[in-house]
Amino acid sequence: QSDFSPGAVYDEVVTELEVANVVGMITYQQELDLAALAETFDERDEITDVTYEPADNHWLQTRFAPDDTYVAFYRTGRCSIAGCRSIEHFEPMVGSVNAVMRELLDFEYEPAAEISNIVATSDLGSPIPLELLTLELGMDAVEYEPEQFPALMYRGTNHVILVFASGKLLCTGLTDLEAVSEAVANLGGRIQAVV
């Protein structure tokens, strides 16, 4: 038996967004010698972990202090940063990575850095009838197979929002917080139509 009440009303569509992960890229305008970087990184205090196994992976995996943020380096000159808990955390991490790379590489330019994905969660505070929501949103925008995965997957234009029966939402695929907030608020409004 469900604890869903058809009369449930949300005080606010979105109570609060919590950023779970910010992912981004830095592009250096040159190829990287990953073996040489791995050797050098092993000696750096600001890098807490270095893994380079070219037989298994084509990238160099590192963790940067102080909070073990994951940073992967690719031979093509790209660098991926994952695990930042906010945009405010991402920007100084880019600075830390660039500071290390400036000491190791010869470049005068400012490497391009951009956020490629923000993962954020929200809690609507009330249970959601996922079967009814599937009908409201339409099968072309929704995947819901409860025997395989406990959430409804809503596909927006350039994002995905997982909707859990508990009222929790997880949004991924967008690159700025305003867009995330707008996407979650829009879906929250449509969820209200079925409760």
Q: Language-model features: where?
A:
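Intrinsically disordered, low-complexity polar/charged tails and linkers
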Residues: 1-80, 84-161, 166, 174-195
